């Protein structure tokens, strides 16, 4: 219940419960652009089916929330918290995820590279730690590279679709989806193959400032 209330407060501040409907964001690349690491079939299903379902269900939950608030129906407001957390988190997480991926791959540079070297010793160390912790997620969830307000980078995992910032306070920089729909058609049950450090090189050249703005966009109606 405390987590649900915390999520509700953060989501409200972020503009997640706004009146216009959330929409599925366009991808900045074709479905086949990430092959062979991620197949076109997985990308098409993941984006147009799974993410779209989170968007649809989030809109339904927000409509029910608005009705309950107008009626002063506190019981219904409370009962909607899990749906808002799950579908709102799914929408936020995937909106960040698509922007993290790059057809050309690439390595961190500039401000982000300096922060990674400071906090992990090297990019390779960061990738290895991120891969190991993400592979170890039990069931469905996400692995994240994020940072705290002071700027220190941390690796964290979240179960299901729990959004990183609302759950841990970390601002998300780079996320890895380890729900089976993200890899099973291609990698079957061998999750670790997808998460070997060479696969994580799909990470683009992102900056701390750019990623902060990306996270803010992912929680707004206009950016969704």
UniProtKB/Swiss-Prot annotation:
Highest taxon listed in the record's lineage: Eukaryota
Q: Which Pfam families match?
A: Sod_Fe_C (PF02777), Sod_Fe_N (PF00081)
Q: Where is it located?
A: Mitochondrion matrix
**Cofactor binding note from Swiss-Prot or TrEMBL:** Binds 1 Mn(2+) ion per subunit.
Q: Name one GO cellular component term.
A: mitochondrial matrix
The entry's family comment says: Belongs to the iron/manganese superoxide dismutase family.
What protein name applies here?
Superoxide dismutase [Mn], mitochondrial
| Organism per entry | Charybdis feriata (Crucifix crab)
């Amino acid at each position: 219940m405390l987590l649900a209330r915390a999520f509700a407060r953060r989501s409200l501040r972020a503009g997640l419960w706004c009146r216009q409907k959330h929409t599925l964001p366009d991808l900045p690349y074709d479905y086949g652009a990430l092959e062979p690491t991620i197949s076109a079939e997985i990308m098409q299903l993941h984006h147009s089916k799974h993410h779209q379902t989170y968007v649809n269900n989030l809109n339904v939950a927000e409509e029910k929330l608005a009705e309950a608030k107008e009626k002063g129906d506190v019981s219904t407001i409370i009962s909607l918290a899990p749906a808002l957390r799950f579908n709102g988190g799914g929408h936020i997480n995937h909106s960040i995820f698509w922007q993290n991926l790059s057809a050309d791959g690439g390595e961190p540079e500039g401000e982000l590279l300096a922060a990674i070297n400071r906090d992990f010793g090297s990019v390779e160390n960061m990738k290895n730690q991120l891969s190991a912790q993400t592979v170890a997620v039990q069931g469905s969830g996400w692995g994240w590279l994020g940072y705290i307000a002071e700027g220190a980078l941390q690796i964290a995992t979240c179960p299901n679709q729990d959004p990183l910032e609302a759950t841990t306070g970390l601002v998300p920089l780079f996320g890895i989806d380890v729900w089976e729909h993200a890899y099973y058609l291609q990698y079957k049950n061998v999750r670790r193959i997808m998460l070997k450090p060479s696969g994580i090189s799909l990470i683009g050249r992102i900056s701390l400032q750019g990623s902060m703005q990306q996270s803010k966009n992912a929680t707004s109606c206009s950016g969704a």
